[in-house]
A protein has these predicted regions:
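Conserved phosphate-binding loops in N-terminal lobes of ATP-dependent enzymes
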Residues: 27, 40, 44-64
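Short beta-strand-loop/turn "lid" adjacent to the catalytic site in phosphate-handling enzymes
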Residues: 57-94, 98
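Conserved phosphate-binding catalytic cores of ATP/NTP-utilizing and phosphoryl-transfer enzymes
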Residues: 1, 102-132
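Short glycine-rich, Thr/Ser-proximal phosphate-binding strand/loop in the N-terminal lobe
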Residues: 8-46, 151-159
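Short beta-strand scaffold segments in enzyme catalytic cores
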Residues: 13-19, 115, 133-135, 141-145
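General beta-strand structural signal in soluble alpha/beta enzymes
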Residues: 5-6, 70-71, 104-109, 165
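A short helix-loop
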Residues: 8-9, 24-25, 127-129, 135-136, ...
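Acidic, glycine-rich active-site loops and adjacent beta-strand->loop/helix elements
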Residues: 12, 72-77, 108-114, 140
């Protein structure tokens, strides 16, 4: 089964093709002005509308049939969890799934983080049983109780969270002070890997 996944989160436009393994993984960071610590949602939406066709083009140009489309539609699987930037991916995904006459699956950005972590760790078997996950990303520092829902997707229930500055925000603030482009995590990681003392 060949599936196209789309995610238009607050700072990255992403698309991937998966068929038992990752066949394509394309992404573009949203441009953030030097010294800024983020984007307004209206700016994020604007950039996703411009970037998603560029991200999808190399995938779609191959003309390979897809069996399903998956798309993140909210930050978390919780009532009231909403950011306008996810509407861009949702609209593109619905159009593609409709044109291809294939099913579409909706999930949260957080579910994507959980599934990606399990995939990269070779632990997809955990999707069939309850486990504890730590989601440390951007504006999120949370401990989550995760169990499969009736569709087999990871359903996360908040167990604990930071009450002040989130870990990702701390990384970004330090990075901006160092003059790095936002979001700063990838650039700080490169600096750390180059450090020899």
């Amino acid at each position: 089964m060949r599936c196209l996944g789309i995610d238009t989160s607050n700072y990255t436009t992403s698309a991937a093709v998966f068929a038992g393994e990752v066949l394509e993984n394309r992404r573009m960071l949203l441009p953030v002005k030097p010294g800024e610590k983020g984007l307004r949602q209206s700016d994020a939406v604007f950039h996703h509308v411009r970037q998603l066709p560029q991200v999808l083009a190399p995938i779609l140009e191959k003309g390979e049939a897809m069996d399903a489309v998956g798309v993140s539609v909210s930050p978390r699987s919780a009532e009231g969890s909403y950011m306008p930037c996810f509407l861009v991916g949702k609209g593109f995904a619905q159009a593609l799934a409709g044109a291809w006459c294939v099913p579409i699956e909706y999930f949260s950005h957080q579910q994507g983080h959980i599934a990606a972590a399990l995939y990269s760790a070779g632990k997809l078997d955990l999707l069939t049983k309850p486990f504890l996950a730590f989601h440390v990303s951007g504006g999120t520092t949370e401990a989550l109780l995760v169990a499969p829902d009736r569709d087999g997707m990871p359903k996360a229930v908040l167990a604990a969270q930071s009450l002040d500055l989130k870990a990702g925000q701390a990384v970004d603030r330090v990075g901006v002070m160092l003059g790095l482009p936002f979001p700063c995590g990838p650039e700080l990681e490169k600096l750390a890997l180059r450090w020899t003392d």
